[in-house]
């Protein structure tokens, strides 16, 4: 049964507080609310696609309040990506492959499904604890705007892959994120790093600051996320 985009409401555990938006940038909305509403504020958007509106979207953004200086705090982004991968995997057949193309693109069986971003509080410095951060993700919910089959062979959507209730992914994400933060607390940063590294396209390991380590060298997460993402443009995920 396909759930209506108009009536769906998330079922989230504490400490999350949800706000649904009909349009606009969920990540920007979360950043605007972060100073006043704080950690656990979750903004989401679920819209249907069409010839005039473009592809359907499933977007989420959650406010985090780290207690580590920025290099360590960026592991919150690593946890967010790993949690999103686990949420997607929980709602698709086990033979389907969910991968992260470093540092920010989500791939579903080699096709682009969307990606993620990290927004920092203004004035955040490398040696200081950020006042807040926002982990935001955007997924292609449907591609009903495509008039010619096969026109965009490098992307895929949730609807095409049988996700009948896309917001359930956000509910699973929220639970997996809490679980990963708990593992981080009790098992150390390595638990979060392993969860992300296990989904990396092309393999590799993740360091304590979220940096990518491969045979060819090390790439810092901060500068990688600061670059313009290749998976989206100003309007959202690329098809």
Language model feature labels by segment:
Residues 108, 214-215:
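Structural motif
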Residues 158:
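Surface-exposed, charge/polar-rich loops and edge strands
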Residues 19, 91, 145, 154, ...:
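Histidine (H) residue identity feature
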Residues 45-155, 163:
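Nucleotide and nucleotide-moiety/phosphate-recognizing core
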Residues 1-93, 195, 221-239:
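N-terminal lobe of the biotin/lipoate ligase/transferase fold
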Residues 142-144, 161-171, 217-225, 229-238:
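RNase H-like, two-metal
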Residues 161-212, 233:
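Conserved, helical-rich catalytic subdomain that frames metal- and/or nucleotide-binding sites
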